[in-house]
Curated annotation (Swiss-Prot):
GO terms for biological process: L-tryptophan biosynthetic process. Homodimer. GO terms for molecular function: anthranilate phosphoribosyltransferase activity; magnesium ion binding. It catalyses: N-(5-phospho-beta-D-ribosyl)anthranilate + diphosphate = 5-phospho-alpha-D-ribose 1-diphosphate + anthranilate. The keyword Cell membrane does not apply. This is Anthranilate phosphoribosyltransferase. Its cofactor is Mg(2+). It comes from Lactiplantibacillus plantarum (strain ATCC BAA-793 / NCIMB 8826 / WCFS1) (Lactobacillus plantarum). Anthranilate 1 binds at G79, N110. Its EC number is 2.4.2.18. Mg(2+) 2 binds at D224, E225. 5-phospho-alpha-D-ribose 1-diphosphate binds at residues 79, 82-83, 87, 89-92, 107-115, 119. Belongs to the anthranilate phosphoribosyltransferase family. The keyword Disulfide bond does not apply.
Amino acid sequence: MIETAIAQLTNQENLDFTMSQQVITEIMKGQATDAQIGSFLTALAIKKATIDEIAGAATAMRSQALPFKVKRPTLEIVGTGGDRSNSFNISTTTALVVAAAGVPVTKHGNRAASSKSGAADVLEALGIKIDLTPAQSLALLERTNFAFMYAREYHQAMRFVAPARQQIKIPTIFNILGPLANPAHAEMQLLGVYRQALMAPLAEVLTRLGVKHAMVVHSRDGLDEISAAAPTDVIVINHGQQVTRILTPEQFGLTRCDHAALIGGSAQVNAAITRAVLTGEPGAPRDVVLMNAAAALHIAKPQLDLAAAFELAQQTIDQGAAAAKLAQLIQSSQAVMAS
């Protein structure tokens, strides 16, 4: 199958959903050589992946992941990465605030790729255990409204792809598949993308994957987040219907910050920023987290408009619930790991 796909791609012919799904499944079962995988990924990158190709590949990745069977709809807050902004861990900090506000969050992530600190790195630096089994993570979700699925453990078949990706050293379809391959099949999602051209295709892919409520965002200062330093382009998804809008800090009553104020560093540095935000320290990191938390809460609770969702995010931090959530997660993750 992969040989046929390579031939099609080199002729600039698109793959349909089924063929894309079959090829990625073949790759992730170890049935393709490194040379074949490298050729396939390079040819697809040159042609540029279509919605069918991305959706098929994401479906294959989901099917090969360790199962994580949730009992209720959950929310994912994630960025594609690759924006080269070196911002602190905005999505992860936002996820903790949203969980503290009562929304079940299933965060899927990894260690750093293009940044100095990935979601796994900063959660570990905060004292949260990340290497939990699915059963332990499900128990943590029930206790705390938050679970982290470490991509390396849930997508073990990615080991078949790693050598070819390292050898060809170019961005491939796998750079955008991670945020689409949440093992919990989250029905709600705040998805940040590193390039504006990816917004519309990935919005369509989310709908095909069964996501009911979502926002796909890209800020004009290049973040794969909603930015407190620039306007952010947004596609809102509600049961397959899409609406585009622009969000600015001023709409939330905030003063626009300099992009430099959002830059982080190592996992330890970013963990300190996260703690400061969760304990109510004012400044640009708090502002950007509040904006993203407002969007996420609006996705999860559509009855709240953005202004009400922003107020809920503020209350969650200022009344101590966010800091308490972090303390609970540290204690509970250690407890479930020991059980």
